[in-house]
Amino acid sequence: MKQIRPYILLLIVSLLKFISAVDSNIEGPVIGIDLGTTYSCVGVFKNGRVEILNNELGNRITPSYVSFVDGERKVGEAAKLEATLHPTQTVFDVKRLIGRKFDDQEVVKDRSLLPYEIVNNQGKPNIKVQIKDKDTTFAPEQISAMVLEKMKEIAQSFLGKPVKNAVVTVPAYFNDAQRQATKDAGTIAGLNIVRIINEPTAAALAYGLDKKEETSILVYDLGGGTFDVSILVIDNGVFEVYATAGNTHLGGEDFDQRVMDYFIKMFKKKNNIDLRTDKRAIQKLRKEVEIAKRNLSVVHSTQIEIEDIVEGHNFSETLTRAKFEELNDDLFRETLEPVKKVLDDAKYEKSKIDEIVLVGGSTRIPKIQQIIKEFFNGKEPNRGINPDEAVAYGAAIQAGIILGEELQDVVLLDVTPLTLGIETVGGIMTQLIKRNTVIPTKKSQTFSTYQDNQPAVLIQVFEGERALTKDNHLLGKFELSGIPPAQRGVPKIEVTFTVDKNGILHVEAEDKGTGKSRGITITNDKGRLSKEQIEKMINDAEKFADEDKNLREKVEAKNNLDNYIQSMKATVEDKDKLADKIEKEDKNTILSAVKDAEDWLNNNSNADSEALKQKLKDLEAVCQPIIVKLYGQPGGPSPQPSGDEDVDSDEL
């Protein structure tokens, strides 16, 4: 690469050795997961190519929704269907809460917009729902874990074997706390997160795997809830990130909210009814506005019709593409600020960008495409990859790299999104690792004491670009004590920052005089889940998995019994089957047993799977001997299936 930083070739070699040494111990399949705000996607690298996997409905993206209704947990497509019926019991957009504090400005805003209850649990936002008439709270990590578990199940269904390892993507501008919280979610889901990679970097892998000549690309990743921009240079299998910027609280959900606010005001003006007081009405509107937004990517006008949005009132309004663009114009243009920032950080002119790669469902919006094209002086963005699947595709490639799946020559060099440093006297932010430094990386700096005979130093670690620590984000702190008495400035305290391949920071301080040291892994600052909390959440997740399994078994057993009842009815009453061949007494015996079973089924809706299976056996014990007796008769029937035999397809 012409612009490659001087030390990069050495780093590439060490990275290759690092990857082969660390990742060679990983066994079994490794899947790639795009854990999105609104939708998630999973892929796997198999037989030399990436497969993006379908969910149970045949869709390649799955809603990041979890619902708790009538004691039953649903995840994905089924959960999203509950949103309009049970808005306070359906959880979504949890990516906007994960790794944040309860009083964060963005969380405060979301609390007023989301229909479910968000409560304060030791300074962290937790979600409160009712399960079996009891209030139950979940950390955002637990809800994300349920979505990850769903992705794992989709992969296991495709591969036909257990999956324990995954590469998971996060927004490039996720801070340390949000990254660690995402790893915790993976642990709760029973996954070993072998790598966390940035979403635009994953998309670049998807776009540029076959690129041999040096190519500079700008990845513009606008999803449902987050926005990232990265500049990368791809050269013969080496993917080097030069700069990254973004906004972890900007995306399609915000565009929807602008439209919703517009229609809420209009409805109140016409009907003197505030829809905000009715959570079900808001969810109905949210659903239709999202559909309208998608439609406006291909048409210029669409009608929104909601019958009985509130009692006695229908909703019928037209939304034009022009109005949608007007309502969101400032948000659309806000996305250009990170674009300008990465160009400045990478010291790139617009003309030096070879390709603009659009990623994320929101980049389908025509106005977004127009704004980007105009900003780059008429250059057409590349539309060669599926914006919904590109990130999962890249994550699957990274998974293949880790397993050594014909991708040994691909090297990924990502960067730190924010500057890392410590507080020194006067509240100064002393930088150790600057933003856009290639990772993994390590940096040491020597400090000293401020006062004579100072016995300890407090190491406070911050993240951000401001000169004073009060304007930056505190990641964590620890104390190094036992410093021998000495004059101010004499003790030598070496502070070492190490950022690993997942972008997670480790900090160590050592008194060079005594050799005494202390360190911490900076994770989710004071809000990080403890080991005990994670263990409990793993147990809770297993309990939910058991409950889901029991529910599936119950539904299956109930269906088997009901199918057998209907089959026996048809068998003895249909002239094409046994009606003309069976003796009257035998027919009455079967019909009587069938009626008893039907009545029992109607009166025992809460029966467990074992009781249902036993009832089926009891019914079979009455019916089967009669059916078998007829097999030997001339012109006798074909054998009837028992209730627990496999049939060609499940009933809907």
Swiss-Prot record:
Q: Where is this region: Nucleotide-binding (NBD)?
A: 124-277
So what EC number does this one have? 3.6.4.10
Residue sites binding ATP per the record: 36-39, 95, 224-226, 290-297, 361-364
Q: Which UniProt keywords apply?
A: ATP-binding, Chaperone, Endoplasmic reticulum, Hydrolase, Nucleotide-binding, Signal, Stress response
Activity regulation info: The chaperone activity is regulated by ATP-induced allosteric coupling of the nucleotide-binding (NBD) and substrate-binding (SBD) domains. In the ADP-bound and nucleotide-free (apo) states, the two domains have little interaction. In contrast, in the ATP-bound state the two domains are tightly coupled, which results in drastically accelerated kinetics in both binding and release of polypeptide substrates. J domain-containing co-chaperones stimulate the ATPase activity and are required for efficient substrate recognition.
**Gene Ontology CC entries for this record:** endoplasmic reticulum
What start and end residues bound the annotated signal peptide? 1-24
- Quote the PROSITE patterns the UniProt record gives: ER_TARGET, HSP70_1, HSP70_2, HSP70_3
User: Which intervals of the chain are annotated as region Substrate-binding (SBD)?
Assistant: 397-496
Lineage: superkingdom: Eukaryota
Instruction: List the ranges annotated as motif Prevents secretion from ER.
Output: 649-652
Q: Which InterPro entries match?
A: ATPase_NBD, BIP_NBD, Heat_shock_70_CS, HSP70_C_sf, HSP70_peptide-bd_sf, Hsp_70_fam
UniProt-listed Pfam families: HSP70
Compositional bias of kind Acidic residues? 643-652
Q: Which family does it belong to?
A: Belongs to the heat shock protein 70 family.
Main function: Endoplasmic reticulum chaperone that plays a key role in protein folding and quality control in the endoplasmic reticulum lumen. Involved in the correct folding of proteins and degradation of misfolded proteins. Acts as a key repressor of the unfolded protein response (UPR).
Protein name as catalogued: Endoplasmic reticulum chaperone BIP
Q: Which gene encodes it?
A: BIP
